């Protein structure tokens, strides 16, 4: 306890985290993209290479998953205005939200119904391509739909993939790996929803369940993979490949905005609110957004009050050297996708200069907003996907933050607030009814 007191003396906000209070932290260390980019260790070229790889796989995906055929084998989500929800939030919180609120529906992405369809599927495809190229079975000029042939399935069945997950990452990696022909094992933490485990098993995926949290599931997955030279472990805490799979979203969103005639520039700022677990998904997306929109996009991460691992790590500068359990927080939350006690050190260090801030919200707040969104817009999400929804009113109320960045009333009036909905499109009906019943 003495150590916690010392920590609080140096970092006063820790007291609110320990008390499980909804907390907002505006990052005093935010820099321009030009200053912050070198610390990421990845470049625009890396993201472009990921774009190109996904384009090579498009013919394969269009055939393997017919639901992607209309989009030409591209796994991408809609971005929609949510004016009724914006009004409801203003009414419930008594706070005007300047500008326009939009929802990015990664909750309804093809194949696995969450943001993890970006990174997880991309890393599996990257590994499959690498193996096939090295074996001389494929060239990058081939039509990749050849990967659907029995010969390739046979080849991939000699290899296996392992991952540790609270649910959604396991879902995307499991479904994709099984489709390609890999043997796949998903190590699931105690938070993982039963329906996610059942869905994986229905695809022939081996699910190993733990009574412990996410960190233990990842560690056990890593250990199990080390003993098998043909097993590839997808490391959610450190993977650059996953990160790049998420980063592709930036250019794609820019194209969607261009189609909609939506302007993002110095006088029309873009604020983006991303739910954060270990950090790979929001970190990669935020990196891609920064490359696409430069200093005109402002990214915020959102975490449950019971799992504020990234806020704790970035705010104290301790990154993965501290966990929420170290300050007496239990890491138990209804937002199963965000139930992570120790953040990715890679993501925290890469992105700490490119984030405008982080905030926490209570499980009940997520349930409330889940209900309001269903009532007002007819859109149903899982609890973690609502974490971003609390962002706009926090930003609009934060006059000190607005002054620090020199936002005028006109700029705020022209702003776009994009809430990144991370999952929920595949939640079974009975489970969704339980979620809706918990809202006020």
Curated annotation (Swiss-Prot):
Q: Which UniProt keywords apply?
A: Lyase, Pyridoxal phosphate
**UniProt protein name:** D-serine dehydratase
Q: Keyword Lyase on this protein?
A: yes
Which is a GO BP term held by this UniProt record?
D-serine catabolic process
**Required co-factor?**
pyridoxal 5'-phosphate
Alphabetized GO MF terms: D-serine ammonia-lyase activity; hydro-lyase activity; pyridoxal phosphate binding
Q: What is the lineage of its organism?
A: Bacteria, Pseudomonadati, Pseudomonadota, Gammaproteobacteria, Enterobacterales
This chain's source organism reads: Salmonella paratyphi A (strain AKU_12601)
Subunit and partners: Monomer.
Q: What class of enzyme is it?
A: lyase
């Amino acid at each position: 306890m003495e150590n916690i007191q010392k920590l609080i003396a140096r970092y006063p906000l820790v007291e609110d985290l320990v008390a499980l209070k909804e907390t907002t932290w505006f990052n005093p260390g935010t820099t321009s993209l030009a200053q912050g980019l070198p610390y990421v260790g990845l470049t625009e070229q890396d993201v472009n290479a990921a774009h190109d790889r996904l384009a090579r796989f498009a013919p394969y995906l269009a055939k393997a998953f017919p639901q992607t055929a209309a989009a030409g084998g591209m796994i991408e989500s809609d971005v929609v205005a949510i004016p009724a929800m914006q009004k409801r939030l203003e009414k419930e919180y008594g706070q005007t939200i300047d500008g326009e609120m939009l929802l990015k529906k990664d909750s309804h992405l093809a194949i696995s119904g969450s943001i993890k369809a970006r990174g997880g599927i991309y890393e599996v495809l990257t590994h499959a391509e690498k193996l096939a190229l090295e074996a001389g079975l494929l060239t990058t000029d081939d039509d990749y739909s050849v990967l659907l042939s029995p010969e390739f399935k046979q080849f991939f069945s000699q290899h296996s993939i392992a991952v540790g997950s609270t649910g959604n990452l396991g879902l995307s990696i499991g479904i994709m790996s099984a489709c390609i022909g890999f043997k796949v094992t998903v190590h699931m933490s105690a938070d993982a929803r039963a329906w996610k485990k059942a869905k994986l098993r229905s695809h022939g995926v081996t699910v190993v369940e733990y009574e412990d949290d996410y960190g233990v599931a990842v560690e056990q997955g890593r250990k199990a993979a080390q003993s098998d030279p043909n097993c590839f472990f997808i490391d959610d805490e450190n993977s650059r490949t996953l990160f790049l799979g998420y980063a592709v979203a930036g250019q794609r969103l820019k194209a969607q905005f261009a189609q909609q005639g939506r302007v993002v520039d110095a006088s029309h700022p873009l604020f983006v609110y991303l739910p954060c677990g270990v950090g790979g998904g929001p970190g990669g997306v935020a990196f891609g957004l920064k490359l696409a929109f430069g200093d005109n996009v402002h990214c915020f991460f959102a975490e449950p009050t019971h799992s504020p691992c990234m806020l704790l790590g970035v705010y104290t500068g301790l990154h993965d050297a501290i966990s929420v359990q170290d300050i007496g927080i239990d890491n138990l939350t209804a937002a199963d996708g965000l139930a992570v006690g120790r953040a990715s050190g890679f993501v925290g260090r890469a992105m700490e200069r490119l984030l405008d801030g982080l905030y926490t919200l209570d499980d009940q707040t997520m349930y409330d907003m889940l209900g309001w969104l269903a009532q007002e817009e007819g859109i149903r999400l899982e609890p973690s996907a609502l974490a971003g929804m609390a962002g706009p009113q926090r930003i609009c109320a934060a006059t000190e933050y607005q002054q620090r960045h020199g936002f005028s009333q006109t700029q705020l009036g022209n702003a776009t607030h994009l809430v990144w909905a991370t999952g929920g499109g595949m939640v079974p009906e009975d489970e969704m009814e339980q979620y809706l019943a918990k809202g006020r």
